[in-house]
């Protein structure tokens, strides 16, 4: 299996690649995990992973038209895709961090700052471990997990106005926070699977064996 971690000058590329290798080993999957922005690699990949940290606008600019087109072509042809943190956010219609920036438009909704005014105790960024709520068996990504397992979050912006049908798991932080989304062969996690220890490795392993 060829797994490509998209190189778009974003953060966490090496740690995401290493986590994917470890998850593959745990699942007994032979996986060649590479970090690349090369069209041949991306268009011939068996799995695509888009990590991300930083601002939505900066990450979107890092993709540029060429990588956007490659990702659109590959995923339209059925290649499973996993976005992590800002990589997940880029799947939506647009983001409002540092001005309005268009996303990939694969899922409904937009990325806005979480509302500190709604809860006096809310502090941003939302950083640290938080519990995941989901319906067991509803999606392969959560196989082997139980509601109440924890993911590691670091973000101040989150998905708003999304479609309930895209939601796989949520967390609570002053309000409901979309934690895992999926539509067809495209999925994403708001939390950092590469930092989420056994839970993250389980999700990555499920992604590697996932057929949408």
UniProtKB/Swiss-Prot annotation:
The keyword Cytoplasm applies. It comes from the Bacteria. Pfam families: GATase. It catalyses: 5-[(5-phospho-1-deoxy-D-ribulos-1-ylimino)methylamino]-1-(5-phospho-beta-D-ribosyl)imidazole-4-carboxamide + L-glutamine = D-erythro-1-(imidazol-4-yl)glycerol 3-phosphate + 5-amino-1-(5-phospho-beta-D-ribosyl)imidazole-4-carboxamide + L-glutamate + H(+); L-glutamine + H2O = L-glutamate + NH4(+). GO terms for biological process: L-histidine biosynthetic process. It is found in: Cytoplasm. This is Imidazole glycerol phosphate synthase subunit HisH.
């Amino acid at each position: 299996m060829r797994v490509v971690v998209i190189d778009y000058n974003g953060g966490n590329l090496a740690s995401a690649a290493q986590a994917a290798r470890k998850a593959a080993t745990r699942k007994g999957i032979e996986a060649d995990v590479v970090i690349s922005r090369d069209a041949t690699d991306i268009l011939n990949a068996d799995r695509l992973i888009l990590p991300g940290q930083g601002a939505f606008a900066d990450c979107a600019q890092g993709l540029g038209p060429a990588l956007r087109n490659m990702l659109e072509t590959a995923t339209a042809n059925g290649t499973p895709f996993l976005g992590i943190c800002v990589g997940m956010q880029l799947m939506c219609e647009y983001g409002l961090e540092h001005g309005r920036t268009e996303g990939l438009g694969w899922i409904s909704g937009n990325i806005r700052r979480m509302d500190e005014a709604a809860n006096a105790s809310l502090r941003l960024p939302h950083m640290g471990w938080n519990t995941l709520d989901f319906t067991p068996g509803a999606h392969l990504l959560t196989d082997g997990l139980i509601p109440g397992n924890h993911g590691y979050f670091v973000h101040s912006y989150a998905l708003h106005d999304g479609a309930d049908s895209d939601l796989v798991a949520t967390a609570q932080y002053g309000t409901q926070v979309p934690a895992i989304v999926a539509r067809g062969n495209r999925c994403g996690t708001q939390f950092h699977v590469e930092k989420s220890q056994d839970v993250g490795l389980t999700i990555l392993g499920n992604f590697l064996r996932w057929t949408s």
